[in-house]
Amino acid sequence: MALWAKARVWMAGPWLSLHRARPLGTRASAAPKAVLPFEAMPRCPGNKWMRVLQIWKEQGSENMHLDMHQTFQELGPIFRYDVGGRHMVFVMLPEDVERLQQAESLHPQRMLLEPWLAYRQARGHKCGVFLLNGPQWRLDRLRLNPDVLSLPALQKYTPLVDGVARDFSQTLKARVLQNARGSLTLDIAPSVFRYTIEASTLVLYGERLGLLTQQPNPDSLNFIHALEAMFKSTVQLMFVPRRLSRWTSSSMWREHFEAWDYIFQYANRAIQRIYQELALGHPWHYSGIVAELLMRADMTLDTIKANTIDLTAGSVDTTAFPLLMTLFELARNPEVQQALRQESLVAEARISENPQRATTELPLLRAALKETLRLYPVGITLERQVSSDLVLQNYHIPAGTLVKVLLYSLGRNPAVFARPESYHPQRWLDRQGSGSRFPHLAFGFGMRQCLGRRVAEVEMLLLLHHVLKNFLVETLAQEDIKMVYRFILMPSTLPLFTFRAIQ
């Protein structure tokens, strides 16, 4: 992407629109202007097929978030971007998110990932809601929401997550206390990944895997590697037309299919076990989302499998990386860490009595997670394929156009978030703060918001709650971490963390 990021700017002069952004729900009183045609919109310089070649040559686009951010600085708050056979519009101001929300149809459309679709078509698998548009998407989504996204569902699976989070903290504490100094310096990332798999598997399938022990299940470790391979190959294939990449990237397609094969096998084994237990009439108790869906019996088994696999694949990296970046920010902002610790200690008795209270008793910790996702959004864009003509930044956007909101730039806009480079969770709680005027968009909006958002939120909330009340978290690293785009935004490297037990 550096090829076009360094290209000559098409529009001369500094761009000041970033510093005049308005929060959602406000309107400027400027006189109306004549709407400009779509063709007049600034276009990202460079050849669309050269971009495909660049992605193929670099085996991805790791700096996409930075390149797009720079393009906004050069071209203004809206621009056209073409890559290969795809045409899209990028925006980054709150007012444009609001317009997209207002234009939301009954069946919000978004671009479907060609590599993921290609695998399912080749293997004869049904698609889950992540890979559907139209009436079938809406029907399936409305049937999934009660057992995955609703507040009653959250109340059912929160105690399961709490048990895993407590085990994580106790296991870590045992390791720390083996050291005479009462502290331990380590790479915590593998443990956090195991936690997210352990918690998500329990919530989905009602099954503990034993990943928090010293000798974790090899199948689950292979599952982590399969996810990494799937995400990496997705980026390398998603922008290149399949008719071209089948010749230029045949080994990458093979790696992509093999990764999905393992993910499907992993999930299918768990679903089959639950199905057999229910068929045998085992005594019922809440044992996860899949069992609830099977007992509800308003979706076919194949549909349940398709959506469970989407949730399984999307429940690990997308939760682990925000947890790791939150630990990093708290380690280099000890005053914020202490405020969060005090909140957790005050609320501990009530949360211990009823883990569901964590979602209401820890407002500052919830704000810290919002702040992490503002700076490091796992998904760098939100997108909609608009169903009707609309106007964004005074340009006509024809129906059918794919519009992408770059969350990375939106979260770092000083007109929306004061001192955007600083880690300041309190901004989300201040009555006059930017966070109180602007919604938290990391999980999307409307009917197409992330189906697993409540699972992810409670997994992050409870792990941090139990870690903070038991440990001081420190790091020698104070410099910003380089983030890379590999289908999701992730740190290129992570520093070592020191955990000091609190007696």
UniProtKB/Swiss-Prot annotation:
Gene3D superfamilies documented for this protein: Cytochrome P450
Membrane topology category: Peripheral membrane protein
Signal peptide: none
Cellular location(s): Mitochondrion inner membrane
Statement: the UniProt record of this protein carries the keyword Coiled coil: no
Broad class of enzyme this protein falls into: oxidoreductase
E.C. designation(s): 1.14.15.4, 1.14.15.5
Record-given protein name: Cytochrome P450 11B1, mitochondrial
Record organism: Ovis aries (Sheep)
